[in-house]
């Protein structure tokens, strides 16, 4: 589970078995885990996060999207 970014209480990561899926990132805080597709950016599952937190998370992803996609491609060799 490579962690690609930490911002405040949020950990952004993907699972090593995620290679077969479209490019995405998982976001974790405490016992909550959301999933967001990166191309284009869209919420897949909110994992118990509130709407306001999802909004914050999506803004972080928008600002870091290129780096997240690069980390995915570096890890999976795409």
Task: Annotate each language-model stretch with its function.
Residues 1-10:
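Negatively charged, low-complexity tracts enriched in Asp/Glu with abundant Ser/Thr
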Residues 4, 43-45, 64:
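Generic preference for hydrophobic/aromatic residues in regular secondary structure cores
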Residues 1, 19, 68-69:
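Detector for methionine-enriched segments
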Residues 49-78:
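C-terminal structural segments of small proteins and small subunits
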Residues 15-49:
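A short, structured beta-strand/loop element
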